[in-house]
């Protein structure tokens, strides 16, 4: 079982439905999300990104193996 993560900036430091939807979309591009659990964690500012508040979204996925 593979685990994927996506780090996204959080305007005003809040988790919104729009941000959660974007995270699900980004994770779905990497593979099929397995189960119905997505972990949400506070993340360090990624290198080269402006300061602010970031969330890291993690999910178990079944990766796409074919050509896209």
From Swiss-Prot:
Organism annotation: Mycobacterium phage D29
Q: What is this protein called?
A: Gene 42 protein
Q: Which domain of life is it from?
A: Viruses
């Amino acid at each position: 079982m593979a685990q994927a993560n996506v780090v996204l900036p959080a305007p005003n430091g809040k988790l919104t439905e729009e941000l959660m939807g974007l995270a699900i979309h980004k994770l779905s591009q990497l593979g099929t999300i397995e189960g119905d659990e997505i972990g949400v964690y506070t993340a360090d500012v990624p290198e080269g990104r402006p300061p602010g508040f970031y969330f890291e979204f993690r999910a178990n996925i079944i990766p796409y193996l074919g050509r896209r």
